[in-house]
Every structure is written in C-alpha cells, then in structure tokens.
Amino acid sequence: MKSFVFFAACFAIVALNSLAHAYPQKLPVPIPPPTNPPVAAFHNSVATNSKGGQDVSVKLAATNLGNKHVQPIAEVFAKGNTQGGNVLRGATVGVQGHGLGASVTKTQDGIAESFRKQAEANLRLGDSASLIGKVSQTDTKIKGIDFKPQLSSSSLALQGDRLGASISRDVNRGVSDTLTKSISANVFRNDNHNLDASVFRSDVRQNNGFNFQKTGGMLDYSHANGHGLNAGLTRFSGIGNQANVGGYSTLFRSNDGLTSLKANAGGSQWLSGPFANQRDYSFGLGLSHNAWRG
C-alpha cells in the first residue's frame, strides 16, 4: 500500500512538472503609461513699426521635457527691426509643477543687459476657480551709466469660470509706482463664440511729481476657428481719452495642427487732449511650428 501511494505521488509530481513546461506561467510586468515626446516649438512674428521698418521676433521653446509632476522650462528668443538697430536676445530657464513655478531670464542688446527672476503659485479653489500669485524682479545694467534700474512686480488674481479679479503693483525704482485693479467677466460663450468684458483702473505715481490715473474697459470676442476682435477705451486723467481696436485671424493651419500662420492688425486714436486725432496703426504676421522629437 505504501509503495502504491509513493508511486502515485511521484506520478503526480511528474505530471505537474510536464504541465508547467507545456504551459509556462509569467508574472505580468506593469507597463508605464505612455509619455509625450519632447517638443521643439518655433514661433516667428512680423509686425509693422509706426516709426519705420518691421519688428521681427523669433522664439524656440522646448516642452514636455519632464513628467506629469514636474516640467522644466527652456527657451531662447531674439527681437529686432528690419531697419537695423539693437537686437534683443535672451534665454529663459525654469521649472514648474504642483501649482508652483520659478524661472530666470537673461536678456541683452547693444545698450543694456537685464536679469529677471520670477516665481508664481496657483492654488485651486474647487473645480472652476483658482487663486494665482506672481512676483518678479528685473535688474538692468546700462552700459556707461552707474544707475541700475530695477523693476519689481507683484500680482494676485482670482479666476473663476466666468468672473475674475486681480490687483497688481509695479515699482520702477527711481521712476514710478503703479497700482492696477481690474475685473473681468464672460458675457457669452458657446461651442464657437466667446465674448469677454473687462474694466480696470491704474494709479500712476511718478517720482517727478506727475501723477495720473488710467481707467478703461474692453470687449474681447473670439471664435473657435481662430479669429477674434477687440475694442477698448482708456481715459488718462489730465491728458485725454484714447480708443483702441484690434483683430486677428488664423490664415492657415496644417492638418496635423503643428504649423499655423496668423495675421493681426490694430489701431488707436486719441479722442481728446493734446494728442487729439493722433493715430497709430500696426499690422503683423505670426508663424508657429511645433517639431516633434523622439
């Protein structure tokens, strides 16, 4: 009897071993979710300068360098005029993630060089509202001049689904101190159309004793196909009123959405004051291309 049990046990072991070889079992290996490859985005724009020539700007930015938690920032840019003069060139590096961000920007031309530091925080207040705070400081060194201008800016904005409000302060050391308050609202929107309205007030105090206020409002319309119009009116206390209109249109967009060509135009006219009837116009083209890199 014992021999029979032993023989049966051996037979069972051999059978199980044969099954294991015939049907091997593998533990599932977790596959990480796909990540977007890095993108090199190229932006180019040309705009008419009322003083002559065309203002040309180019920018090359790298995105999707990090992961869903942390995103590095890297870009280089240059701006100049077709009639010559100084060419502004610079670079920005930084990092953002978890609603926080910080960056530094270095710019240089033939006259001065600037170094800008910026930090921001975005606090979500539910599904459709957020509180955004920003601070920045720009230090400028002008060749041949001991005076070093410094511009400090800070802002706090509450942005909701259809309403928003903000307050900001810009201090240009030795020149001016500006406090701006604004309110914005979405008047109408659907799948194709969007209309926003905003009003603002700025109190400008200059170190030379000339103080004034700017108050104004604007209507901004945009279409889902990439077209838009805006119109605004600004009152400068003690100076006069100025009207502004502008528009933009997407002239071309590639089938893959990586390349687009946009045109913009704008104009302003003083309605009263010492600059009454003075007009300024601007026209521009902007080319953007996102080149995917594996």
Curated annotation (Swiss-Prot):
Gene Ontology terms: cellular component: extracellular region
Induction or repression: In response to injury of the body wall of the larvae.
Tissue specificity note: Synthesized by the fat body and is eventually secreted into the hemolymph.
Positions of post-translational Arginine amide modification: 293
One GO biological process term: defense response to bacterium
Proregion positions: 23-24
Domain of life: Eukaryota
InterPro entries: Attacin_C, Attacin_N
Residues annotated as signal peptide: 1-22
Keyword flag Secreted: yes
Sites bearing Pyrrolidone carboxylic acid, chain numbering: 25
Subcellular location: Secreted
Keywords: Amidation, Antibiotic, Antimicrobial, Immunity, Innate immunity, Pyrrolidone carboxylic acid, Repeat, Secreted, Signal
One Pfam assignment: Attacin_C
Keyword Signal included in the entry's annotation: yes
Summary of the function given for this chain in its UniProt record: Sarcotoxin II is an antibacterial protein which plays a role in the inflammatory response of this insect. The main effect of sarcotoxin II on E.coli may be the inhibition of cell wall synthesis, including septum formation.
Family membership: Belongs to the attacin/sarcotoxin-2 family.
Further details from the record: Sarcotoxin II consists of at least four structurally related proteins named sarcotoxin IIa, II-1, II-2, and II-3.
Protein name, per record: Sarcotoxin II-2
Protein species of origin: Sarcophaga peregrina (Flesh fly)
